[in-house]
């Protein structure tokens, strides 16, 4: 499974397939927090960052 993290409208989002999931992290927070969050929700997934 591939998970893409992306900044949109001031928040980090996870994109899984065609679903866009808003995270509780603002775009000013560290990317490492978002990656840890994604790994906890989707263990074993490949995580990519999109600009």
Regions found by a protein language model. Name each.
Residues 1-16, 48-49:
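Short N-terminal "domain-start" leader segments
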Residues 11-12, 36, 44, 51:
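Intrinsically disordered, low-complexity segments enriched in polar/charged small residues
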Residues 19-22:
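Short, surface-exposed beta-strand-loop junctions and turns on beta-sheet-rich folds
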Residues 25-46:
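A short, charged, amphipathic alpha-helix used as a generic interaction element across diverse proteins
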């Amino acid at each position: 499974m591939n998970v893409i993290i992306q900044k949109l409208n001031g928040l980090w989002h996870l994109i899984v397939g065609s679903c866009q999931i808003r995270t509780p992290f603002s775009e000013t927070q560290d990317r490492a927090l978002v990656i840890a969050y994604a790994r906890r929700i989707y263990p074993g997934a490949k995580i990519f960052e999109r600009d």
